[in-house]
Amino acid sequence: MMVKAVKKKTVTKINKKTSAPAAVKIKSRRLSPLADIDPDNAVQVLNRLWEVVMQRRDADPAVSHSARLLSRGIGKVAQKFGEEAVECLIEAVSGDKEALIGESADVLYHLLVLWVAVGVEPAEVWRELTKREGISGIAEKASRAKILPRAAGLKTTKIP
């Protein structure tokens, strides 16, 4: 039976220079066995996290990490998502499963922040995934419209 550890946040003292909360310390706590996790509940967890990010987008950026990210604009949100995705890939290649799990959670969180930044709701993504369910990746990709790039100033996609 496999058990995974997650990060538990505990807030430390207030920083006297900025009057903002000091850095958040992270410590691990044990979760129930993976067999106890209901897949339907996993979607609900993501939906609830999206709601939290939505609520915090208008919060004080000095207090909320989500608000701080969103206040910096879509470019910074996308950059942070990319950084987290790269960290996830590094852990996958390194073979450190626990670190990969933690980085995967970071990727999901930052993906949700990205969705909030551009106005995508989780249900829209779940609907797209449902449409693709049961279709092979090759067949699904072949069914997409083919859009050929055009060089600047050309009215055709044909190569001269």
Swiss-Prot record:
**Pfam short name (any one):** PRA-PH
Which reaction does this chain catalyze?
Answer: 1-(5-phospho-beta-D-ribosyl)-ATP + H2O = 1-(5-phospho-beta-D-ribosyl)-5'-AMP + diphosphate + H(+)
**Compartmental location:** Cytoplasm
Top EC class for this record: hydrolase
Keyword Nucleotide-binding (UniProt): yes
GO cellular component terms? cytoplasm
Q: Which InterPro entries match?
A: HisE (IPR008179), PRib-ATP_PPHydrolase-like (IPR021130)
Q: What is its main location?
A: cytoplasm
Per the record's keyword annotation, is Hydrolase included, yes or no?
yes
Keywords linked to the UniProt accession: Amino-acid biosynthesis, ATP-binding, Cytoplasm, Histidine biosynthesis, Hydrolase, Nucleotide-binding
Q: Which GO terms describe its biological process?
A: L-histidine biosynthetic process
Which molecular-function annotations from GO does this UniProt entry contain? Answer: ATP binding; phosphoribosyl-ATP diphosphatase activity
Q: In which pathway does it act?
A: Amino-acid biosynthesis; L-histidine biosynthesis; L-histidine from 5-phospho-alpha-D-ribose 1-diphosphate: step 2/9
- CDD domains of this UniProt entry? NTP-PPase_HisIE_like
User: According to its UniProt record, which protein family does this protein belong to?
Assistant: Belongs to the PRA-PH family.
- PANTHER family listed in its UniProt record: HISTIDINE BIOSYNTHESIS BIFUNCTIONAL PROTEIN (PTHR42945), HISTIDINE BIOSYNTHESIS BIFUNCTIONAL PROTEIN HIS7 (PTHR42945:SF1)
Q: What is this protein called?
A: Phosphoribosyl-ATP pyrophosphatase
- The organism encoding this protein is Granulibacter bethesdensis (strain ATCC BAA-1260 / CGDNIH1)
Q: What is the lineage of its organism?
A: Bacteria, Pseudomonadati, Pseudomonadota, Alphaproteobacteria, Acetobacterales
